[in-house]
Amino acid sequence: MKHPFQILITNKKGTHIFAIVKNYLQVFDISKGGGDDDIKVGEWQDTTESNHPKIQIEKRTGRQISTQQIHNHLRYLILTPDEQHIIASTDSDKSILIFKIDFNNSINCLKLIKRQPIPKRPSSITIDSQGQRAIVADKFGDVYTVSINDDSSMSEIEIEIEKDIQPILGHVSMLTDITMATTHHNNNNNNNNNNNNKQFIITADRDEHIRISNYPKSYVIKNFLFGHDEFVSQLYIPVQYDPSILISGGGDDFINIWKWYEGELIETIQLRQYIESYLSDDHLPPTRFRTETSPKEISIAKIATLRTNDEEEEEDHLLIVLVENTPVLLVFNLDDSYKAKYLQAIIVNDSIIDFAIAADNKTIITSLESEQHSIKYFTLQEENDGKKFSEIQGPNIEQFIPIEVEQKSDFQQLYTIFQLRKRSDS
């Protein structure tokens, strides 16, 4: 059977899906009107061997060292604002990969133009508003920047690697997510225009902190957002709709909505009442930390929004939340003041690994931990009780997955966010 996709993202129009499965990056044109056979328009495989010390010692000595296996998997995937480049990271050599996207190339739309090593393994990636630099957080709490250079005349990876790159900011705790924010939509009613188009880095860590730092002068901290009790794993700004808003979630039973520049918490959405029945014993604490009254724990895997723009219909602003290792997407309707109303649960038979939104046709694409039919599509439709997401037929992109496994236990570890939760023996 096929190994499922671990990461899905789409371009703004939702015409293309970019997907990661283990050490492969694939691109699909789901707008094609023809058959499924011609929808794959790009593919790249990472064949670089790990430079982990364990691997190098084994190669030199011939002795096998019994430690946790180091895989050459791809992680994290983000498009630049102009969608001309896509950025990924590797486990094998702790590098940032920068690809040029050229849909005019009928053979392969992906061209690797830079492979930049990072001192420690990346934990999250974002892009500055000009699309000139990738901002990279690592598992040791540091943040680096990597230039996104492009020279269309180059036929190979010839861009000079940046040597001895230095962190631009740091946390004392492991960084769990990072995003960029700008103020150009925040101060329309402010007579002082000095803040217009200013950039900020927003970082989250395992210690419940959300920090807002100036960029590029990131040693200047604007403020902190305090409102979480557990780790923060997701920072989401609806850039296309309202970049003044930040939505955050992690190990708490709730997600928060902020006016990030003002440091104002404007809404808290409680999730347990909607997700409790979909939690399993896998969500209990490890045995050594478990008591008779231990609740099943919530870990937020992904947050996204979708705003409909139908001229003939009332506009909807929808918030979609994925709790890790559950077979459900929670959908909320947000009003103009960002007060949330529960809309529906999109339920499938297997745990959802990731999802992406094709905004123009109001479709959600999900990747499932399934032995068959690991991709499902849902679109927003008018029903008797209002608009709801319903399953539809979509392009069969899973047929192109190049990784075969014997059984589900051979899948790569698909759920890791729960490991961010801090434990105590006391």
Swiss-Prot record:
Spans of the WD repeats are 69-111, 170-225, 227-270
Q: Which domain of life is it from?
A: Eukaryota
Q: Name one GO biological process term.
A: tRNA (guanine-N7)-methylation
Entry keyword set: Nucleus, Repeat, tRNA processing, WD repeat
Q: SMART domains given for it?
A: WD40 (SM00320)
PANTHER family, per this entry?
TRNA (GUANINE-N(7)-)-METHYLTRANSFERASE NON-CATALYTIC SUBUNIT WDR4, WD40 REPEAT PROTEIN 4
Q: Which Gene3D superfamilies match?
A: YVTN repeat-like/Quinoprotein amine dehydrogenase
Query: What is this protein's function?
Result: Required for the formation of N(7)-methylguanine at position 46 (m7G46) in tRNA. In the complex, it is required to stabilize and induce conformational changes of the catalytic subunit.
Q: In which pathway does it act?
A: tRNA modification; N(7)-methylguanine-tRNA biosynthesis
Q: Which InterPro entries match?
A: Trm82, WD40/YVTN_repeat-like_dom_sf, WD40_repeat_dom_sf, WD40_rpt
Cellular component aspect of the GO annotation: cytosol; nucleus; tRNA methyltransferase complex
Q: Which PROSITE patterns match?
A: WD_REPEATS_REGION (PS50294)
What is the designated name of this protein?
Answer: tRNA (guanine-N(7)-)-methyltransferase non-catalytic subunit TRM82
Similarity comment: family membership: Belongs to the WD repeat TRM82 family.
